[in-house]
Amino acid sequence: EFRRVLFRSIESFEELKAMQVAERAKMTVRDGLAPTEANLAKHQVLICAGTGCTSNKSAEVKAALEAKLAAEGMDKEIQVVQTGCFGFCSLGPIMVVYPEGTFYNKVEAKDIDEIVEKHFKNGELVERLLYTIPGTKEHAKDMKHIPFFQKQKRIALRNCGTIDPEKIEEAIAHYAYQGLGRALTTMNSQDIIQELLDSGIRGRGGGGFPTGLKWKFATGYSADQKYVVCNADEGDPGAFMDRSVLEGDPHSVIEAMAIGGYCIGANQGYVYIRAEYPIAVHRLEIAIKEAREIGLLGKNIMGTGFDFDIDIRLGAGAFVCGEETALLTSVEGKRGEPRPRPPFPAEKGLWNKPTFVNNVETLACISYIFLKGAQEFASVGTEKSKGTKVFAMSGKINNIGLVEVPMGTTLREIIYDIGGGIPGGKAFKAAQTGGPSGGCLPADLLDTQIDFDSLVKAGSMMGSGGLIVMDETDCMVDIAKFFVEFTQDESCGKCTPCRIGTKRILEILTKITEGKGEEGDIEKLEALAKNISTSALCALGQTAPNPVLATLKFFREEYEAHIRDKKCPAGKCKSLFTMVIDPEKCKGCTLCARNCPVGAITGTVRNPHVIDAEKCIKCGVCLDNCRFGAISKQ
């Protein structure tokens, strides 16, 4: 069920500004200031309600805190607020207490009594729930002192973890729709396009095309109907940037879509989002409904005569529907298959009408640009890549989560300064950027700047923002196989190069990882990859071979070891190693035998054990449990 918005419709830009002032007065505690008469609560407790923390039972934490405060009669002086993602997903559930900004991590419902007793009654910190700075015994009391946050600059994520995304008044308090008001009251189409061109913003969905030019092209075509489409179909493995924006600040996207509609002369927008994002869908539905109720969507927005509304279209999770022409076909209710280009969507898009498609992060940045001005955005980043970029960090990295950094930040800074380095003291091996369409960059390219052009020059691409980190135990042939397996499975099948070509590549990679590789296989892979990249119909097919080409470029010796020596240097490919116990190191503790899931290890107490190679499934459990380094892969 949706709550009813108890505000009258906003009929002018001036009314919106007045509402912003009134609502911000209720949130002074979150700004580190004293409470006001508008909201007398002495503390505001922000609890992450993003997908990551929700999966770790943050809703139970919130419910337990609310119940405890009510029982203690403290619910009037302490306000509990659900927010979107803070970014530090590996520490969830996260709770931040204002006005001091105390950052508690890995909070459970059972911790609530102690938090209320110590923090709210006695004014003491619950130190065991504070973040411990790596390499020290020091506790960080707030986000400003946590290295993960120190090199970040939040533009697209500016309100995530700050506001309740299900209450439009909190978004308005943080200047939501002010950029729209500015555009509607002081700018025409040419002014809006020039603002985007001056900002230097390029599409964050992977292509990096100048957004101002895209809007300019759509403006240039005349039609009785035009459309604005938001691409929220985030299909890259390990990517969750767009989901987090919609979960934490959906109004930033809605506002930018309305600005786009005003610019190109469209009165209808669509958000295409995958159904696998239930929280994002729910919050987007709430945001659209509340924006309509308050008069920021629908007819005569802010009394300017501009009409614009937004509907949601759910996708079924097909990776190919991230390609804009396939997405538009899916919105039309047809099978999601790419269309030949030209004509481009700006000329013939949704239902053959002029359309522009922008992804979630791009739109979140656009609303910031119209709030702060083009120069503010352009002052961040590099000469050709302005602003910031959001990355979803995953894989073999200590600080898994969502980060937003200025363009030009190096890969090393992201992985080590923000990401906290590689777990277990293992060596960094590669970072995959750009998802299945990108490439793996090795250790000697760690100082590569993260911007559109530098990544392409290095042999990868920006993509939508997935960043998967690999260590010395990862096999690069197996990694290439994983991504090709994904793209082959997700191929729409419309064109032969992608449908059949990726299947042939996958067959060769599978053969190599099973120890059946032959001389000439590498050359076959290169020829197939180049043919597919030049002849596939859409960008997804054209870039499908990139993981193979990148790993061949930087890790060719691993392919050669698999083929010529029948060895996997990383010890990952099960067909190419056996588990062995060194009798001189084995102490006969029986720990490996007791944990083996198939009973492949035999031996008596205090005597060397033996692994039965016939029974062994090479799961690695024995290797993880051995305390004496007696087990190895050979």
Question: Language-model segments: what does each one mean?
Answer:
Residues 69, 256-258, 408-423:
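Short amphipathic, charge-patterned alpha-helical segments
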Residues 91-96, 497-503, 591-610, 621-634:
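Iron-sulfur cluster-binding cysteine motifs and their immediate structural context
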